[in-house]
């Protein structure tokens, strides 16, 4: 069957927590602080082809909570997924990997981060929604401004939350 007759295919094969780390360098003293922490959140995405039509997409989020100048906790989590993507026009593949896949993975990542922070004894942190289309467009703009030969990992987006 010629390629032009094949229907585009986008399927989730698997969603998994690729990595999770939590540090509490100032526990237990930090629990006695009455001030609310300030949060710094950084987000990055990457997609890699694993086989013909099979891609791994990963969203990484780092959350650092500080009270005054002391770190209350630092969480880094990587949520990944295996996606089968076939017969997609070339101009649609990168947006599918940079927008579609992260949009699917991010809710799982948000839940895993909130759970880890709660299990560490802190109030849950509910990360804001991310518009991955705007994130992707910003990444493309940043790529155009950088020199060739840079890493395949997408630049991080930093968010501030109170």
UniProtKB/Swiss-Prot annotation:
The keyword Cytoplasm applies. Signal peptide: none annotated. The keyword Cytoplasm applies. It is found in: Cytoplasm. One of its GO terms (biological process) is protein folding. One of its GO terms (molecular function) is unfolded protein binding. Gene3D superfamilies: SecB-like (3.10.420.10). It comes from the Bacteria. It holds the Pfam family SecB. Keywords: Chaperone, Cytoplasm, Protein transport, Translocation, Transport. GO terms for cellular component: cytoplasm. Its main location: cytoplasm. Homotetramer, a dimer of dimers. One homotetramer interacts with 1 SecA dimer. Belongs to the SecB family. One of the proteins required for the normal export of preproteins out of the cell cytoplasm. It is a molecular chaperone that binds to a subset of precursor proteins, maintaining them in a translocation-competent state. It also specifically binds to its receptor SecA. This is Protein-export protein SecB 2.
């Amino acid at each position: 069957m010629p390629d032009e007759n094949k229907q585009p295919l986008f399927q989730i094969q698997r969603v998994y927590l690729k990595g999770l780390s939590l540090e509490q360098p100032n526990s237990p003293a930090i629990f006695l602080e009455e001030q609310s922490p300030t949060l710094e959140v950084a987000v990055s995405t990457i997609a890699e082809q694993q086989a013909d039509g099979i891609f791994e997409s990963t969203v990484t989020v780092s959350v650092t909570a500080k009270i005054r100048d002391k770190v209350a906790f630092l969480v880094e989590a990587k949520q990944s997924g295996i996606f089968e993507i076939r017969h997609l026009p070339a101009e649609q593949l990168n947006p599918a990997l940079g927008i579609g896949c992260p949009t699917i993975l991010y809710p799982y990542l948000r839940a895993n981060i909130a759970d880890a922070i709660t299990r560490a004894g802190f109030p849950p942190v509910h990360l804001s929604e991310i518009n991955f289309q705007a994130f992707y467009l910003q990444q493309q703009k940043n790529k155009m401004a950088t020199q060739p030969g840079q890493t395949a990992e997408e630049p991080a987006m930093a968010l501030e939350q109170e």
